[in-house]
């Protein structure tokens, strides 16, 4: 089987990136190659994948409307060329802006909706063709779909459990890992840590959108000190060590989370999650067992004081039961095979 995966037009794909959609794409790409399939990945130049990268030259720096349009044009041109140059069985779209470069073809097209449905062009989603399959990444996300929007499947994201290892003896810091932007509520994590009197390590990327840059400069940088640290993007062993050593992960997200890979990674590391109950976070965290769900930074501070009562082993067991990348890959493979079988039946009927 040959799968052509298409990223968001302005986000690099790798296992180290801050974006959940890009991490999922990278995980599926690696699993496809490991299973003996052919994986093609259309993504911005500089992305890292196990399959064949089809690199798009897209703008860097300030990501304004002009940059978005330029990136989409580049993706559209490369995607059309790739479908002409390669024999592809499945096209899998991952980007928020996929509608701007959706290929006009008869191949099965899977669209994973990684972000809140309200962020997409809903009218365009309502006009999906019969060969296009819309996938939500959590039940919480699917439940937000308007009645007239067809959601074809729900496949919960997963993480590579082998990269994370629990520690029974935790260090004395709490952790926040996310994109550094207002909807992730990083400033509220700082509020909670200061109120609880604990050290906070903040990790993640500040993307080149003006509102993200302004948020970091006005709301985060002025509050950094010997107790509040910003370490930037982390990955690999550094990320795994930070995760396993933390007393807990703070996730005060203000937007409805469609998924949360970082919360799944924390549980895989034996680290409880204290989160606002927005979207899928309320599905991931089991209050009193693998973390706490709170509504304000003051409650988050109180929960930090109680988090040492939770079992790292229970957190790990929950990750193993529900959030493995193997389970996610298996469900996508089942979907791919089902779509190809349906296509073959339709071709035979038309013959």
PLM features: what roles do these ranges have?
Residues 1-351:
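Catalytic cores of nucleotide-sugar-dependent glycosyltransferases that transfer UDP/GDP/TDP-activated
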């Amino acid at each position: 089987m040959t799968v052509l995966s298409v990223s968001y037009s302005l986000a690099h794909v790798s296992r180290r990136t801050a974006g959940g959609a890009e991490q999922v794409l990278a995980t599926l790409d690696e699993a496809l190659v490991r299973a003996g399939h052919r994986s093609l990945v259309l993504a911005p130049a500089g992305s890292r994948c196990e399959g064949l990268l089809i690199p798009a030259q897209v703008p860097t720096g300030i990501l304004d409307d002009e940059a978005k349009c330029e990136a989409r044009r580049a993706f559209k041109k490369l995607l059309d060329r790739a479908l002409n140059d390669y024999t592809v069985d499945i096209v899998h779209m991952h980007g928020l802006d996929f509608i701007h470069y959706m290929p006009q073809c008869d191949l099965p097209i899977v669209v994973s909706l990684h972000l809140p449905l309200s962020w997409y062009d809903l009218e365009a989603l309502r006009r999906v063709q019969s060969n296009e399959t819309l996938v939500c990444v959590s039940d919480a996300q699917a439940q937000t779909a308007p009645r007239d929007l067809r959601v074809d499947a729900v496949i919960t994201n997963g993480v590579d459990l082998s990269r994370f290892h629990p520690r029974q003896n935790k260090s004395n810091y709490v952790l926040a890992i996310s994109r550094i932007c207002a909807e992730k509520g990083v400033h509220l994590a700082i509020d909670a840590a200061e109120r609880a009197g604990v050290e906070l390590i903040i990790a993640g990327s500040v993307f080149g959108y003006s509102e993200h840059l302004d948020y970091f400069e006005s709301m985060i940088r002025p509050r950094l000190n010997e107790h509040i640290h910003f370490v930037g993007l982390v990955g690999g062993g550094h990320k795994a060590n930070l995760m396993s050593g933390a007393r807990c992960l703070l996730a005060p997200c203000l937007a409805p989370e469609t998924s949360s890979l970082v919360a799944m990674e924390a549980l895989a590391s034996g680290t409880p999650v204290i989160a606002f109950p927005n979207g899928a976070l309320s599905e991931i965290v089991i209050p009193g067992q693998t973390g706490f769900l709170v509504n304000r930074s003051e409650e988050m501070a109180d929960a930090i004081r109680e988090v040492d009562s939770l079992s790292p082993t229970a957190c790990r067991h929950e990750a193993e039961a529900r959030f493995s990348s193997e389970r996610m890959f298996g469900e996508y493979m089942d979907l791919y095979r089902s779509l190809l079988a349906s296509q073959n039946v339709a071709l035979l009927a038309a013959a």
